[in-house]
């Protein structure tokens, strides 16, 4: 076949996008005795496919915190990804395990299976007395439809129990009293808990466009994702949630600097007899994953105690100027200057008032 430089470059990028590959170099070597033939050699430098992290911390609110995670992107040399995460503190316990096979079929169909358990006594370290316990699992398939695009479909099952007390916020007490299967639990000494238990079956669908030149530490290309989840009829609570993210990497000044632009939008609404999104489905703003410089999960609506409660609409955007590092560290770490903007809203609380604060009413002629 004729040598196509564009196809060779594309093969190089495909290899670079593997999470366990650090660098790829291409060499065209002439075949001895045949001046019209060349051998295309790919020199691949691998990165460590396994990542392990763990820590012990202490805070005034959470007390002793234990956390650990194991991620292996080339498990037993199969190319499969296995991830285990453990987090345990005074107010939250999170455990999850997932397995992803990127080539479940010869056509490149991906399958991901995951299970999770969480027990969260408080939404944030400053939240009121409110407990969420849930366990569930997800099966998700991804279907490539072009070089850069993938469609995904799956099903999630979640069993949840939410518990509040007379010391909880008004929002928490209202939600458990009006959704799912409410119950009252008397634990003695005059203490009464109000709770609800419910099962949800969520259909999930997504679209991904990814033209980045690397899966880790990309410096050019675009990544877009849109995900939609819908709690189907038959679930004890019904809702939908949609999320869109856009990330663009723009190389600058001889490819030594990179401008990264990221935006994220999210919205969710309760459906049917459900009065509001389940509290654990609310969006939160602030912290390293959304609006840096603000306390984690501290932006947006407040509960009746003036503490973060989350909202059903998320708007956030980040701009990073990624600074050049020595070649030794360029593929292992990044430093950047950033500017973030965003917030979380609750559309159920939107009202229109005049300049004196009086509510406005509009009556058509």
Short names for language-model regions:
Residues 2-218, 222-223, 289-308, 312:
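Gram-negative/organellar outer-membrane beta-barrel architecture
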Residues 18, 64, 69-71, 81-101, ...:
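C-terminal transmembrane beta-barrel domains of outer membrane proteins
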């Amino acid at each position: 076949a004729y040598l196509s430089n564009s196809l060779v470059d594309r093969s190089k990028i495909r290899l670079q996008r593997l999470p366990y590959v650090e660098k790829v170099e291409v060499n065209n070597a002439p075949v001895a005795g045949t001046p019209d033939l060349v051998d295309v050699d790919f020199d691949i430098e691998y990165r460590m496919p396994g990542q392990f992290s763990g820590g012990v911390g202490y805070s005034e609110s959470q007390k002793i915190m234990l956390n650990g995670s194991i991620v292996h992107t080339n498990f037993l040399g199969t190319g499969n990804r296995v991830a285990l995460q453990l987090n345990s503190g005074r107010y939250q316990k999170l455990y999850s395990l997932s397995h992803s096979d990127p080539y479940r079929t010869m056509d490149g169909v991906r399958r991901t299976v995951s299970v999770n358990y969480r027990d969260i006594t408080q939404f944030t370290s400053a939240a009121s007395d409110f407990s969420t316990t849930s366990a569930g699992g997800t099966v998700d398939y991804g279907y490539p439809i072009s070089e850069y695009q993938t469609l995904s479909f799956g099903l999630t099952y979640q069993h949840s129990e939410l518990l509040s007390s007379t010391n909880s916020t008004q929002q928490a007490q209202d939600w458990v009293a009006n959704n799912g299967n409410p119950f009252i639990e008397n634990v003695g000494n005059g203490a009464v808990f109000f709770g609800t238990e419910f099962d949800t079956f969520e259909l999930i669908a997504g679209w991904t466009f990814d033209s980045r030149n690397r899966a880790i530490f990309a410096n050019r290309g675009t990544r877009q994702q849109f995900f939609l989840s819908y709690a189907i009829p038959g679930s004890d609570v019904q809702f939908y949630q949609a999320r869109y993210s856009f990330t663009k990497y723009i190389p600058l000044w001889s490819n030594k600097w990179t401008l990264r632009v990221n935006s994220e939008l999210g919205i969710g609404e309760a459906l049917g007899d459900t009065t509001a999104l389940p509290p654990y489905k609310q969006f939160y703003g602030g912290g390293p994953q959304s609006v840096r410089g603000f306390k984690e999960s501290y932006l947006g609506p407040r509960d009746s105690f003036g503490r973060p409660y989350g909202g059903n609409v998320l708007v956030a955007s980040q701009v990073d100027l990624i600074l050049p590092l020595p070649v030794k560290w360029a593929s292992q770490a990044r430093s950047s200057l950033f500017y973030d903007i965003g917030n979380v809203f609750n559309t159920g609380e939107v009202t229109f008032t005049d300049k004196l604060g009086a509510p406005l009413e509009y009556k058509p002629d």
